[in-house]
Regions:
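Short loop segments and helix-boundary regions at transmembrane helix junctions
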Residues: 1-52, 86-88, 146-147, 151-164
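Transmembrane alpha-helical segments in multi-pass inner-membrane proteins
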Residues: 136-200
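Helix-loop-helix "hairpin" substructures at the membrane interface of multi-pass membrane proteins
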Residues: 62-140, 163-168
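Transmembrane helix-bundle core of multi-pass membrane transporters
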Residues: 22-86, 187-195, 214, 221-227
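Hydrophobic/aromatic residues within transmembrane alpha-helices
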Residues: 2, 102-103, 172
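Hydrophobic core segments of alpha-helical transmembrane domains in multi-pass membrane transport
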Residues: 22-26, 72-83, 121-129, 152-155, ...
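Cytosolic-side transmembrane-helix boundaries in multi-pass membrane proteins
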Residues: 98, 105, 109-112, 183-227
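Juxtamembrane/transmembrane-helix interface segments of polytopic membrane transporters
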Residues: 22-38, 125, 129-133, 137, ...
Length: 227
């Protein structure tokens, strides 16, 4: 609403909403749930093992012994690719992203299309955040996301706004995130601060290499006004 209807700068409004979300979650966990020690163990998803396939050495536990949301996320990749590049609705989204004024001349409602896209993307981002506590860490505490949303933005840029590319980018960045956890658990002779930095340093390095070559939608970040 702030960026679409009120036409506020998307970077500024996004940063403000991010700060509000951090403060609001901290408030709710203390006031509503009565949490005092800043950490709360939550009900969580258990891994789902695919019969026989999960017993395959090495790749079995990696591919066929994951949480249900992981399988849903993998299934969404081809579904979203088909929707975006092979359906009329996907063409409408692409058109509004490139030139909303031209889209309006052929009967497309740019504001409604943007609202639908923002709501769906926000729901998917929220599911990813929920999985962090419900599927991976099994607890909730302040600022546990630790900037992973910005890594997700980097994944979109790296993927050039393509769901298949986003899957590859997320596997790379997710692998870097997992590596820093594994490295600390293995007791590597590396200061843990450097291990914590690794996913973010890798993100910056990749953005430096591919960021200038990745061209997003022409109208991204630009408010639309009815003529």
């Amino acid at each position: 609403f702030v960026s679409i209807s009120l036409k506020a700068n998307q970077i500024v409004s996004g940063a403000a909403i991010n700060l509000i979300g951090v403060g609001l979650s901290s408030f709710l966990i203390r006031i509503v749930f009565g949490l005092k020690d800043q950490q709360r163990v939550v009900p969580h998803f258990e891994p789902v093992s695919v019969p026989y396939l999960s017993d395959i050495p090495l790749i079995g536990p990696i591919l066929f012994q994951q949480h249900s949301l992981v399988y849903v996320a993998l299934l969404l990749v081809p579904i979203m690719w088909v929707i975006l590049f092979r359906t009329r609705w996907g063409l409408m989204i692409t058109s509004v992203g490139e030139h909303p004024e031209a889209s309006a001349t052929v009967g497309i409602n740019p504001l409604r299309t943007r609202y639908i896209a923002v709501i769906l993307s926000g729901a998917l981002a929220g599911a990813g955040g929920a999985f962090l506590s419900l599927g991976q860490l099994h607890f909730f505490q302040d600022e546990m996301v630790a900037g992973r949303g910005f890594i997700a933005l980097a994944a979109v840029i790296f993927a050039r706004w393509n769901p298949v590319g986003a899957l590859i980018a997320c596997l790379i960045f997710g692998g870097a995130d997992a590596l820093q956890f594994r490295g600390q658990a293995a007791g590597l002779a590396v200061p843990h601060q450097f291990m914590l930095m690794f996913p973010y340093v890798l993100t910056l390095a990749i953005l430096v290499v591919v960021g200038g070559k990745s061209q997003g939608p022409a109208a991204i970040g630009q408010p639309y006004s009815k003529g």
